């Protein structure tokens, strides 16, 4: 279906898109092989293997489970031949105070994920969203400086997720700022 419509790449959310995979913990090696084979035969690159988790949750147990899920997905990335495992920084809308309070938690999560990615030569990609912990170009710059690993940490850029009504009049400066900070660490663009 994708190839017939002119597509050569996709972001894959296995539990949502593939029957027989109800979650990230019950995936078999045979299923991963079947996925890799099907995409390769169709000539479709899996640009991002989705594993969207709440990586900045203030509840330590929830956040640790989220980090573990992403780290597990990094192994799946290798098995299915995906370029990245991707997530957003949160799973809910946050106030400005909550965003500030959860940025150190997100940074800790990303550092642990990227450490694991480096160990197995995988790559994690984070998607900024304005209403989540990581939603401004300044916070992205700070996070990228803290992580400092261009081989194992990239960015999924969805312009709709970061543009607010207040930013509309200043788009001439807004978009170049995002592109400058993302730089060569772009995993993909959501259109």
Q: Residues of each region from the PLM?
A:
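Catalytic domains of carbohydrate-active enzymes, especially glycoside hydrolases
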Residues: 1-17, 80-83
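Structured loop/turn residues at beta-strand edges in well-structured enzyme cores
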Residues: 5, 44, 80, 151, ...
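Hydrophobic faces of well-ordered beta-strands that scaffold small-molecule active sites
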Residues: 8-12, 46-51, 85-87, 124-126, ...
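Active-site beta-loop-alpha junctions enriched in small/polar residues
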Residues: 13-17, 51-54, 90-92, 127-131, ...
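Short, flexible/disordered intra-domain loops and linkers
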Residues: 18-26, 165-173
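Aromatic- and glycine-enriched glycan-recognition loops and surfaces
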Residues: 24-34
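Active-site acidic/histidine proton-transfer and metal-coordination neighborhood
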Residues: 33-34, 38-41, 55-157
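Glycoside hydrolase catalytic-domain groove-lining segments
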Residues: 168-191
């Amino acid at each position: 279906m994708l190839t017939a419509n002119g597509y050569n790449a996709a972001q894959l959310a296995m539990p949502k898109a593939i029957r027989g995979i109800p979650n990230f913990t019950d995936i078999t090696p045979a299923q991963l092989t079947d996925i890799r084979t099907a995409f390769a035969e169709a000539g479709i690159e899996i640009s991002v293997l989705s594993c969207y988790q709440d990586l900045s949750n203030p509840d330590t147990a929830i956040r640790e489970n989220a980090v573990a899920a992403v780290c597990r997905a990094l192994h799946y990335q290798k098995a299915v031949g995906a370029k990245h495992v991707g997530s957003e920084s949160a799973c809910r809308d946050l106030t400005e105070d909550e965003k500030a309070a959860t940025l150190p938690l997100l940074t800790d999560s990303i550092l642990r994920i990227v450490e694991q990615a480096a160990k197995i030569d995988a790559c994690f990609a984070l998607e900024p969203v304005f209403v989540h912990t990581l939603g401004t170009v300044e916070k992205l710059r700070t996070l990228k400086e803290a992580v400092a690993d261009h081989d194992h940490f990239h960015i999924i850029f969805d312009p709709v997720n970061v543009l607010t009504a207040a930013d509309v009049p200043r788009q001439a400066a807004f978009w170049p700022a995002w592109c400058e900070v993302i730089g060569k660490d772009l995993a993909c663009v959501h259109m």
